[in-house]
C-alpha cells in the first residue's frame, strides 16, 4: 500500500496527539482476502466527520460476506468500532456541539467500500460521520461500545421505520392495543437490539431463537419466544398472534427463515423485511410484501455494491437516521438500552482474522465477538 504523510484538512480542530504517517489495518488483497497491512495511510476525514483512535472493534457477518461477494482490492474491512475522538471537522463541530476531543464514542462505517477504500473499522484510526456516532457513558466499556457500534441502529432504523413502516417509536410509543412484531433471529445482536426498541416503542415483540438463548431473548423484551427448529414453529406463531401478525423482520434470511416467516402470516398477509437477498422462488404470496434493506444506506451515500445491494445516495435518509441516533443516545444515557453480550478474542489484528473465521463457521450464538486493537485503553 502507498504511504503518504498524515495531515488533517483545513478547519479541523487540532488532533489531541501527534498523528503517525502510517497505521495498521486489515484490508482486502487482490483476491478480496482479509490481509493485515502495517503501512496504510490514515483516512482523511470530510468536514462533517471526526477522526477517532480505534480502541476496540466488533465483528459482523458482513465483514466476511462483503469481501467474499463483492471483492474490492485495497478496501479496508470492518464496520463497528469504539474509540476516542482525536479531531473534529468544522461541519461536525456545528452539527454535534456536544462532541469534544477526548470523548469516548462508538459508531459504524461502510467497510469493504469499493468507492471509498480507506473506510473500514479494522484500523488504528477511523474517520466517522459525526451525526451517526454515540457517546459512551462512563458505565459502558469500550468492548460494550464496540458491540453497540452503529451499524445495528442504522439497520434497525431502515428496517423498522422506513421499511416496515412502524409508527410507534421510543420517543412516542404506542399506547393502545399494541400489535405483535416478529423478529426472526432474536438472539443475534441485531435481534436483541430490535426487541428492545420494539418494546420501548409500545409493540409486542416476539422472536425465534435456539432454546438455550431463550433467557437472553426474553430479557431483551420478547414476550414470547419460539424454537425455530420446531416443525410447528410457524403454526405456533400464527396461533399465538391470532392471525394479527402483519410485520416480520427476518435477520437471518435463509431458505428456512423465509419459509417460516411467510407461513406466520394469515391470509391477509403483511410486510416481510429482511437483511439479505431473499429467494424469489419462495415469494409465492401476493399478500406478503417483501423488501430487503441495506443498513449501510443510512449514511446517505451511494452504496456501490451489486446484485440488489446497491443503493443511490439519499441525504434525506441520512438526516432521518441521524435523528434516530439522537433517540438511541438518550436511551443509552438513561440506561434503557443494554448492549448485547460480548466475547473478547485476544490477538489484536490477528485476533480479528480469527474472528472472521469463527463467524464463517457459525461458531457464535447469543454473543458478539470483540477485539481490542489498542490494549493501552481497555
From Swiss-Prot:
* Binding residue positions for substrate: 151-158, 295-299
As given in the record, the signal peptide range reads: none
Organism lineage reads as: Eukaryota, Fungi, Dikarya, Ascomycota, Pezizomycotina
What induces this one?
Answer: Expression is positively regulated by the oxaleimides biosynthesis cluster-specific transcription factor poxB.
Keywords, in A-Z order: NADP, Nucleotide-binding, Oxidoreductase
Taxonomy, superkingdom: Eukaryota
Binding-site residues, NADP(+): 62-65, 187-190, 210-213, 228, 275-276, 364-365
Q: In which pathway does it act?
A: Secondary metabolite biosynthesis
> Which protein is depicted?
Trans-enoyl reductase poxP
Provide the family line.
Belongs to the zinc-containing alcohol dehydrogenase family.
- SUPFAM superfamilies attached here? GroES-like (SSF50129), NAD(P)-binding Rossmann-fold domains (SSF51735)
| Functional summary from the UniProt entry | Trans-enoyl reductase; part of the gene cluster that mediates the biosynthesis of oxaleimides, cytotoxic compounds containing an unusual disubstituted succinimide moiety. The first step of the pathway is provided by the HR-PKS poxF that serves in a new mode of collaborative biosynthesis with the PKS-NRPS poxE, by providing the olefin containing amino acid substrate via the synthesis of an ACP-bound dec-4-enoate.
State if Transcription is listed as a keyword: no
Amino acid at each position: 500500500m502507498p504511504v503518504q504523510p498524515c495531515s488533517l484538512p483545513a478547519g479541523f480542530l487540532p488532533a489531541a496527539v501527534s498523528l503517525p504517517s502510517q497505521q495498521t489495518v486489515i484490508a482486502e488483497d487482490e483476491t478480496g482476502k482479509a490481509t493485515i497491512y502495517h503501512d496504510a495511510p490514515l483516512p482523511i476525514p470530510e468536514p462533517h466527520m471526526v477522526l477517532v483512535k480505534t480502541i476496540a472493534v466488533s465483528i459482523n457477518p458482513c465483514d466476511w460476506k462483503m469481501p467474499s461477494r463483492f471483492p474490492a482490492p485495497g478496501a479496508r474491512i470492518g464496520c463497528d468500532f469504539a474509540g476516542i475522538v482525536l479531531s473534529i471537522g468544522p461541519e461536525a463541530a456545528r452539527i454535534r456541539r456536544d462532541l469534544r476531543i477526548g470523548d469516548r464514542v462508538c459508531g459504524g462505517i461502510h467497510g469493504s467500500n469499493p468507492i471509498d477504500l480507506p473506510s473500514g473499522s479494522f484500523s488504528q484510526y477511523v474517520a466517522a460521520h459525526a451525526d451517526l456516532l454515540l457517546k459512551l457513558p462512563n458505565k459502558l466499556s469500550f468492548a460494550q461500545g464496540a458491540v453497540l457500534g452503529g451499524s445495528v441502529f442504522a439497520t434497525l432504523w431502515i428496517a423498522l421505520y422506513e421499511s416496515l413502516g412502524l409508527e410507534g417509536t421510543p420517543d412516542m410509543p404506542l399506547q393502545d392495543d399494541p400489535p405483535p412484531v416478529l423478529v426472526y433471529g432474536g438472539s443475534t445482536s441485531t435481534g436483541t437490539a430490535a426487541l428492545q426498541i420494539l418494546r420501548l416503542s409500545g409493540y409486542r415483540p416476539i422472536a425465534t431463537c435456539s432454546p438455550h438463548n431463550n433467557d437472553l431473548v426474553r430479557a431483551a423484551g420478547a414476550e414470547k419466544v419460539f424454537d425455530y427448529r420446531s416443525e410447528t414453529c410457524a403454526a405456533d406463531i400464527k396461533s399465538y398472534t391470532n392471525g394479527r401478525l402483519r410485520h416480520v423482520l427476518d435477520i437471518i434470511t435463509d431458505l428456512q427463515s423465509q419459509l417460516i416467516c411467510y407461513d406466520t402470516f394469515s391470509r391477509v398477509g403483511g410486510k416481510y423485511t429482511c437483511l439479505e437477498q431473499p429467494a424469489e422462488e419462495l415469494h409465492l404470496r401476493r399478500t406478503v410484501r417483501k423488501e430487503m434493506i441495506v443498513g449501510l444506506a443510512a449514511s446517505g451515500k451511494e452504496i456501490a455494491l451489486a446484485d440488489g445491494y446497491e443503493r443511490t445516495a439519499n441525504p434525506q435518509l441520512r438526516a432521518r437516521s441521524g435523528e434516530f441516533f439522537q433517540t438511541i443516545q438518550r436511551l443509552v444515557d438513561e440506561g434503557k438500552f443494554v448492549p448485547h453480550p460480548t466475547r473478547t478474542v485476544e490477538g489484536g489484528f490477528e485476533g480479528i482474522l480469527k474472528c472472521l473465521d469463527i463467524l464463517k463457521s457459525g461458531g457464535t450464538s447469543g454473543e458478539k465477538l470483540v477485539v481490542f486493537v489498542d490494549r493501552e485503553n481497555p
